[in-house]
Amino acid sequence: EEGTVTVAFSDGTNAQAKILGRDTVTDLAVIKAEGVSGLKPATLGSSAELRVGQDVIAIGSPFGLESTVTTGIVSALNRPVESSDASGDNATVFPAVQTDAAINPGNSGGPLIDMAGNVIGINSAIRTNSSASGSIGLGFAIPVDLARNVAQQLVEGKKVEHAKIGVTVTPATEEDELTGIGAEIREVQDGGAGDDAGLKAGDIITALNGIPVASSSALVASVRGHQPGDVVEITYLRDGKTETAKVTLDSDGGELSEE
């Protein structure tokens, strides 16, 4: 909450920066360097056009080593990733771009770019095990289309609005209680998007726009990849039968965001 932000430039100069706004849902913020002009912005690409297997480059300052460049490929798309701050609070869930490009502490906030130099993601998180604290080839980036939408709202001085269905869900599994099959609806908000589409408690959502949803976090991540007002197709199980419904996504009103 307190402290200063200093931006370091490649020519060795520094500048103080002002935080224009931040969004705790995606753990993104927009800052403005004070008294600086003539900066050349990076070119933003489109994460919607990404394909698994294409080459990517991650840039950052892992462990304080400035301007470190690592390479890899897009390992997966729409990977539901949940991360929290050091206290274990403020969990964020987003539909990540997974990459095997080495990402370590200090890479967060740096760009993931394609081979044409376009930013296609913002490096955000890694998966590690108990015996390793650095990269094991499982890195995750916030898709640039989502980041662009968040940044635009913050620059305009708004609280960031995220899409929602208006349902409370829990993971649904096979009889082995291990294999995820979807997100089971426990509660439907009266007058919400899910209610208007005819969804009911007990329904198990298995896909969104044809992309499988294997858990409740996967559903949250998929929805957050869209904007309020988008129309999506929900596939769900009801009494053992597969049904579909068109849902016009609601807005959370910016209640989860923070300026």
Language-model segment annotations:
Residues 1-177, 190, 217-220, 224, ...:
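Serine-dependent protease modules
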Residues 62-65, 211-214, 240:
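Short, charged beta-turn/beta-strand-edge "cap" motif at the junction between a beta-strand
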Residues 12-14, 231, 242-244:
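A structural signal for beta-strand boundary/capping segments at domain termini and interdomain linkers
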Residues 194-216:
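Conserved PDZ fold ligand-binding element
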Residues 246-248:
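C-terminal tail/sorting-segment detector
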